[in-house]
UniProtKB/Swiss-Prot annotation:
Principal subcellular localization: cytoplasm
GO terms, molecular function: 4 iron, 4 sulfur cluster binding; metal ion binding; quinolinate synthetase A activity
Keywords from the UniProt entry: 4Fe-4S, Cytoplasm, Iron, Iron-sulfur, Metal-binding, Pyridine nucleotide biosynthesis, Transferase
Reactions the enzyme catalyzes: iminosuccinate + dihydroxyacetone phosphate = quinolinate + phosphate + 2 H2O + H(+)
Binding site for iminosuccinate: H46, S63, Y141, V142, N143, S162, H256, P257, E258, T273
Pathway: Cofactor biosynthesis; NAD(+) biosynthesis; quinolinate from iminoaspartate: step 1/1
Short name of one Pfam family: NadA
Enzyme Commission number(s): 2.5.1.72
Protein name: Quinolinate synthase
The record's free-text note on cofactor binding: Binds 1 [4Fe-4S] cluster per subunit.
Subcellular location: Cytoplasm
Names of required cofactors: [4Fe-4S] cluster
Length: 368
């Protein structure tokens, strides 16, 4: 047992017996419980999950899509969310009070979501208001905590996804002169630049120094980017692209917009997870692709398209480590606990936070 497991609250510790069970036995038990529970159990699985987990998901998709699908399954009393913490929070906020959302491993967080906590954000908003007055509107990527979504909700802002970021940023500028984009600076920068906003009219707020970083005239700043990033997509570099161009000049390069501006600019295509999946799906047989996104998804795409030559843009990439905490043993543990009439790792968002966060979510859903 690791030190991390020893210091966890007892309800989040995986019992020892799951470490000794065979994969075959665990898979058999998951199937038995799924069959027994029927429609009262719903298992959403994020695209970045391991195959050992995704094989049992009732729906696969991105975070918001899965939360919406979970909310539409009114028959399901238990939603065992195979993703990370902020995704389970969103599912809890969109489902009914009678439905129970469970995260198989409470350590499955998101480093990017954790880069913007509510205290830092409230402090930043206060300081930025001193500089810019009532000229700002906040937008947050759905990859953020419920508290940050709620902050945006009560301040007239909204959430965005990587698929609809352009639409939502365009909307934001019909509301206010300036935009504060949380927590992923890269998605914010790439989206704003794609809409014609020059880089020198963007600034970065550093929550650790409580300072605004910018190159141009402060009065001309239109976009304030939170200094956060995805730890996975940050690892794709221009050097990776140069190596592909040199060794495979006929290979298409497609990346997620959570990659930095320089990588997106040097790629052939950039878009959401769904965009990447659809692009490869519709590509002709024999086409060649280097993909800049999470490794579990890249490997799954490779398996699904043996007629195409597909590689990771960075050959030394690792999967998302926090997403990978959800594994077959933790999934089975969650299901067997439910089968016994018990509940572990329940995700429950405060009522007021939920109300304000849903405001932000609905402002997005009404416009896309």
């Amino acid at each position: 047992m690791s030190i991390l497991e020893k210091v966890q609250p007892i309800e989040t510790m995986l019992p020892e017996r799951y470490y000794t069970m065979s994969t075959e036995d665990m898979e058999k038990r998951v199937r038995e419980i799924k069959e027994k529970m029927g429609e009262t159990l719903f298992i959403p699985g994020h695209h970045y999950q391991k195959d050992e987990v995704v094989q049992f998901s009732d729906a696969a998709g991105d975070s918001l899509q899965l939360a919406q699908v979970a909310a539409s399954n009114k028959e399901a009393k238990y939603i065992v969310f195979c993703g990370v913490h902020f995704m389970a929070e969103t599912a809890d906020m969109l489902t009914t009070d009678e439905q129970v959302v469970i995260l198989p491993d409470m350590r499955a967080g998101c480093s990017m979501a954790d880069m913007a906590d509510i205290e830092q954000t409230e402090r930043a908003w206060e300081e930025l208001t001193k500089l810019f007055g009532d000229t700002m509107i906040p937008l947050t990527y759905v990859n953020s905590t419920a508290a940050i979504k709620a902050f945006c909700g009560r301040n007239g802002g909204a959430t965005v996804t990587s698929s609809n970021a352009k639409q939502m940023v365009s909307w934001a500028f019909t509301q206010k002169e300036r935009l504060v984009f949380l927590p992923d600076q890269h998605l914010g920068r790439n989206t704003a630049y794609d809409l014609g906003i020059p880089l020198d009219k963007m600034a970065v707020w550093d929550p650790h120094t409580d300072s605004l970083e910018y190159d141009g005239d402060i009065e001309e700043i239109q976009v304030i980017l939170w200094k956060g990033h995805c730890s996975v997509h940050q690892n794709f570099t221009v050097k990776n692209i140069e190596n592909v161009r040199k060794n495979h000049p006929d290979m298409n390069i497609i990346v997620h917009p959570e990659c930095c501006y320089e990588v997106v600019a040097a790629s052939d295509y950039a878009g959401s997870t769904k965009y990447i999946i659809d692009m490869i799906e519709s590509a002709p047989s024999g086409s060649k692709w280097a993909i800049g996104t999470e490794m579990n998804l890249v490997n799954r795409i490779i398996q699904q398209h043996p007629d195409k030559e597909i590689v990771s843009l960075n050959p030394f990439m690792c999967p998302c480590l926090t997403m990978n905490r959800i594994d077959l043993p933790h999934l089975l543990w969650a299901l067997e606990t439910i089968e016994r009439g018990e509940e572990i790792n329940v995700i429950s968002v405060d009522k007021q936070v939920t109300e304000e966060a849903v405001l932000a979510l609905n402002r997005m859903l009404e416009r896309v």
